Swiss-Prot record:
GO MF annotations, alphabetized: FMN binding; oxidoreductase activity, acting on NAD(P)H, quinone or similar compound as acceptor
InterPro entries the record matches: Flavdoxin-like (IPR001094), Flavodoxin/NO_synth (IPR008254), Flavoprotein-like_sf (IPR029039)
Function: Probable electron transporter.
Superkingdom to which the source organism belongs: Bacteria
PANTHER family for the chain: NADPH OXIDOREDUCTASE A (PTHR19384:SF128), NITRIC OXIDE SYNTHASE-RELATED (PTHR19384)
Coiled-coil region: none
Domain Flavodoxin-like: 3-145
Protein name: Uncharacterized protein PA3435
Organism whose genome encodes this protein: Pseudomonas aeruginosa (strain ATCC 15692 / DSM 22644 / CIP 104116 / JCM 14847 / LMG 12228 / 1C / PRS 101 / PAO1)
Pfam families, sorted: Flavodoxin_1
Cofactor(s) needed: FMN
Family: Belongs to the flavodoxin family. MioC subfamily.
Keywords: Electron transport, Flavoprotein, FMN, Transport
């Protein structure tokens, strides 16, 4: 199964988690490809059969600048990905209250618009509680891989 891993990052942490996810999903036998800063055309050319989006949150609960162009292109064009499996790893800081993991929530809303089905609840990684988000994501990623392999 071809898994497109998309990431949005401000300081690079989400990119690190996405790269680690690619290694783990590939080791689990999936064809995982991290596509940072991909255009919609590049993403369509990859022909994903599943999605993993790893994103941090910036500002007042927004997506990072490097993920916004793809996010808005997908929202505008709504590709035919209905029924494909997906998952979201949201990074944030719970001290920001209501906007904690807001970037991930925006991706979840987009999944809903596209009909992408979340195979697991969003993983929320809290910067105020962890210094090893890649390691903290491993149990969730193992469960995600198992769900994709069915």
């Amino acid at each position: 199964m071809k898994v497109a891993i998309l990431s949005g990052s401000v300081y690079g942490t989400a990119e690190e988690v996405a790269r680690h996810a690619q290694k783990l999903l590939s080791a689990a036998g999936l064809e995982a490809s991290h596509l940072p800063r991909a255009s919609l055309d590049e993403l369509k050319a990859f022909a994903p059969e599943a999605f993993l989006v790893v994103t941090s949150t910036t500002g007042m609960g927004e997506l990072p600048d490097n993920l916004q162009p793809l996010y808005y292109a997908i929202r505008d064009q709504l590709p035919a990905w209905h029924g494909l499996p997906g998952g979201v790893i949201g990074l944030g800081d719970s001290s920001y209250g209501d906007t904690f993991c807001g970037g991930g929530e925006q991706v979840r809303e987009l999944f809903g618009e596209l009909g992408v089905r979340e195979v697991l609840p969003m993983l929320r990684l809290d910067a105020s509680e962890t210094v090893t988000p890649e390691t903290d994501a491993e149990p969730w990623l193992a469960e995600f891989a198992a769900a994709l392999k069915g």
